[in-house]
């Protein structure tokens, strides 16, 4: 019998903005250079205030500056936690956190073509429910300690392995991911790696980080 199973597409990079951006113009220039350095599937705007809550004003300002540019580069733009703002900015969709609006509510607001992702932390059940409700992907993590988000819950590689073996819905790995620790997540089955500081704080700069991640993905494909 011939094995007709198709190989899994190689892992792709899911870029997340820094939590605070001081100079929007400078960030736009840096982002443009970063996106031109290699394949980036999506960009999530996740801007937080000092209280840890989403900074709507900053998200609006940054979104207005970079959404069209990123989309022209073939990168899907997602807004963290704010479906209505995503619609206003003309973004491609929204990422919903653990305590955010239900997937079905976001779908009703944004329509059938929007990309809607949902945080599942370390819960297989929560991920399955999000898929049943119409999410386009689920995000598991944190797989490593992270400085960009407080109150994270550890997730194990086995979660990615089990999900990939049983489900079609894409999964994203998140939490403290760098070029040096990413390989086990790719091997375990992550379709996307969501990275923030591992790109923006890379010792050789964000563009070099994008090149390094893509080289890693190719080597493990």
Swiss-Prot record:
Catalytic reactions on record: 2-[(2R,5Z)-2-carboxy-4-methylthiazol-5(2H)-ylidene]ethyl phosphate + 4-amino-2-methyl-5-(diphosphooxymethyl)pyrimidine + 2 H(+) = thiamine phosphate + CO2 + diphosphate; 2-(2-carboxy-4-methylthiazol-5-yl)ethyl phosphate + 4-amino-2-methyl-5-(diphosphooxymethyl)pyrimidine + 2 H(+) = thiamine phosphate + CO2 + diphosphate; 4-methyl-5-(2-phosphooxyethyl)-thiazole + 4-amino-2-methyl-5-(diphosphooxymethyl)pyrimidine + H(+) = thiamine phosphate + diphosphate
Cofactor(s) for this UniProt protein: Mg(2+)
Record EC number: 2.5.1.3
Cofactor, how bound (note): Binds 1 Mg(2+) ion per subunit.
Protein family according to the UniProt entry: Belongs to the thiamine-phosphate synthase family.
The organism of origin for this protein: Hyphomonas neptunium (strain ATCC 15444)
Binding site for 4-amino-2-methyl-5-(diphosphooxymethyl)pyrimidine: 44-48, 80, 119, 149
Recorded superkingdom: Bacteria
GO molecular function, one term: magnesium ion binding
Upper classification of the organism: Bacteria, Pseudomonadati, Pseudomonadota, Alphaproteobacteria, Hyphomonadales
Gene Ontology BP terms: thiamine biosynthetic process; thiamine diphosphate biosynthetic process
InterPro entries: Aldolase_TIM, ThiamineP_synth_sf, ThiamineP_synth_TenI, TMP_synthase
Function: Condenses 4-methyl-5-(beta-hydroxyethyl)thiazole monophosphate (THZ-P) and 2-methyl-4-amino-5-hydroxymethyl pyrimidine pyrophosphate (HMP-PP) to form thiamine monophosphate (TMP).
GO cellular component terms attached to this protein's record: cytoplasm
Keyword terms of this UniProt record: Magnesium, Metal-binding, Thiamine biosynthesis, Transferase
Protein name (Swiss-Prot/TrEMBL): Thiamine-phosphate synthase
Ligand binding (Mg(2+)): 81, 100
HAMAP family found in the cross-reference section: TMP_synthase
Residues involved in 2-[(2R,5Z)-2-carboxy-4-methylthiazol-5(2H)-ylidene]ethyl phosphate binding: 146-148, 176
Pathway(s) annotated for this protein in UniProt: Cofactor biosynthesis; thiamine diphosphate biosynthesis; thiamine phosphate from 4-amino-2-methyl-5-diphosphomethylpyrimidine and 4-methyl-5-(2-phosphoethyl)-thiazole: step 1/1
């Amino acid at each position: 019998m011939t094995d007709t199973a198709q190989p899994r597409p190689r892992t792709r990079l899911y870029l997340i903005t820094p939590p605070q951006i001081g100079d929007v113009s400078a960030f736009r220039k840096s982002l443009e250079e970063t996106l031109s350095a290699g394949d980036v599937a999506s960009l999530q705007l996740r801007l937080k205030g000092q209280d840890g809550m989403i900074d709507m004003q900053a998200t609006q300002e940054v979104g207005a500056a970079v959404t069209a540019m990123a989309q022209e580069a073939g990168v899907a733009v997602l807004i963290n936690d704010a479906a209505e703002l995503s619609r206003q900015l003309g973004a491609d969709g929204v990422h919903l956190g653990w305590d955010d609006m239900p997937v079905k509510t976001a779908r009703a607001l944004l329509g059938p073509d929007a990309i809607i992702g949902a945080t599942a932390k370390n819960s297989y059940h929560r991920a399955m429910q999000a898929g049943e409700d119409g999410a386009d992907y689920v995000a598991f993590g944190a797989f490593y300690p992270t400085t960009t988000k407080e109150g994270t819950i550890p997730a194990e590689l086995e979660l990615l392995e089990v999900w990939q073996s049983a489900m079609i819905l894409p999964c994203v790995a998140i939490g403290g991911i760098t070029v040096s620790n990413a390989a086990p997540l790719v091997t375990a089955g992550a379709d996307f790696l969501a990275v923030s500081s591992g790109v923006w704080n890379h010792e050789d700069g964000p563009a070099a980080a994008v090149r390094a991640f893509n080289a890693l993905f190719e080597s493990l494909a």
